[in-house]
Amino acid sequence: MSYTIYLVEDEDNLNELLTKYLENEGWNITSFTKGEDARKKMTPSPHLWILDIMLPDTDGYTLIKEIKAKDPDVPVIFISARDADIDRVLGLELGSNDYISKPFLPRELIIRVQKLLQLVYKEAPPVQKNEIAVSSYRVAEDAREVYDENGNIINLTSKEFDLLLLFIHHKGHPYSREDILLKVWGHDYFGTDRVVDDLVRRLRRKMPELKVETIYGFGYRMMSS
């Protein structure tokens, strides 16, 4: 399964090295070298945070408080150059799940991440807070991405995604071709409404599990899964 992991590490070389190792496992990695940049991405939550305690503009303890305030259940691994018992205890008190001291082998971190993800999520990662589950798919509305049941991204065009959102947010509602033209293409479109049929056809081909019903002589609607 494809997990999303946020890495906060201010040492550029180590950041790049760990990112490469983590991505080699098939995980989606977003890395930061500053705490302030990580703050901007706290919502929606990833499946896992990896936090360096010592950062140039803040510290991992401050960040984990903010992270846990937004999502108490998201797991966190601390990494630090300090190997002090007080750091480990404080990290646990603040909600971290694991702690690894520098220097360490990247493979050790990978093993810890694997075990923690298995422990927290069992088989598959949960639907993120900005994601919508529809049929066997997960739709990340903010990121404008769609994932199949194996966590693989389904590449949709902008209008395919707009049509998908229209159907998702109005399940069971019948839309005429003219309605869809207006909502997806806008008032400035001039042309045949048959482009709607082509758009629906492409969406069905890419997402065959969607329950999009044809209303003959009128338009379309998406039925509940």
Curated annotation (Swiss-Prot):
DNA-binding region boundaries: 129-224
Subcellular location: Cytoplasm
Xref: Gene3D superfamilies: 3.40.50.2300, 6.10.250.690, Winged helix-like DNA-binding domain superfamily/Winged helix DNA-binding domain (1.10.10.10)
Entry keyword annotation includes Cytoplasm: yes
TM spans (from-to): none
Keywords for the protein's UniProt record, in alphabetical order: Cytoplasm, DNA-binding, Phosphoprotein, Transcription, Transcription regulation, Two-component regulatory system
Parts forming coiled coils: none
Designated name of the protein: Transcriptional regulatory protein CssR
GO cellular component, one term: protein-DNA complex
Span of the signal peptide: none
Modification sites for 4-aspartylphosphate: 52
GO molecular function: phosphorelay response regulator activity; transcription cis-regulatory region binding
Functional note: Member of the two-component regulatory system CssS/CssR required to control the cellular response to secretion stress.
An individual GO BP term: regulation of DNA-templated transcription
